[in-house]
Every structure is written in C-alpha cells, then in structure tokens.
Regions:
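Autoinhibitory N-terminal propeptides
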Residues: 1-112
C-alpha cells in the first residue's frame, strides 16, 4: 500500500476509534458495514459487555433484556453476553453506562 493511502487509513481508524469510545473498533466497523449493505434489517450481533469490578451483572442482565429484548446471559462476574439484531446507535446507547469498561463481539448478516 502506498504511504499516502496508509496515512489516510490510519487517520480514518483514529477518528472512528475516538467516535466509538468503549466500542471495539472492529465490531463497530462490522456493524456499520452491514447496516449499509443490508438496508432492511439490523445485523445480528453477539455482544460481549465487559463491566468494571464490583458491578452486579445479574441486574445488568435484567436491564439489558428488559430494555432491548435481546437474549442475555451472565458469562462471568464481569461479563454479560447479549445476542440480537442491533444497529450502531443501540450499541452506542448501551456504551453510555458508566459501569461498562468496553464492548466487544461480532456481527453478521441477520437471518429471518
């Protein structure tokens, strides 16, 4: 790759990383790409929500399930897993919780 293209790409990644905050950049880019390719359905996301020490993850499981209707389960004492059709706006809304350290996971084409 040319030096100019690499510089542009590095700048792009830096800007996206700043905009996404706690959201893993690869996850965010996957979701946004799928949103643009498949206009009629949100991507299927397997979201790993990593909480800070001391957070009651059982209550977080309930609140995420109640608010969004996702399949949600506690994974360990600091992690909650959520699966459902999500767009980047939903992920950014979830990331607003000050008790979250980071959001990771994967996204794929939704199935009906």
């Amino acid at each position: 790759m040319s030096h100019a293209a690499e510089t542009i790409y590095d700048g792009f990644l830096s800007n996206v990383e700043k905009a996404l905050g706690k959201i893993d950049i690869e996850l965010g880019l996957q979701i946004m790409l799928l949103e643009r390719k498949m206009h009629d359905a949100y991507p299927m996301v397997e979201l790993e929500i990593h909480y800070k020490d001391g957070v009651d993850t059982a209550s977080k499981v309930s609140s995420v399930r109640d608010k969004y209707g996702f399949l949600v389960a506690g994974h360990d004492k600091h992690e909650v897993l959520a699966r459902g059709n999500m767009n980047i706006d939903m992920i950014q809304e979830i990331a607003q919780d000050p008790q979250i350290e980071k959001l990771t996971g994967s996204a794929s084409v939704a199935s009906y």
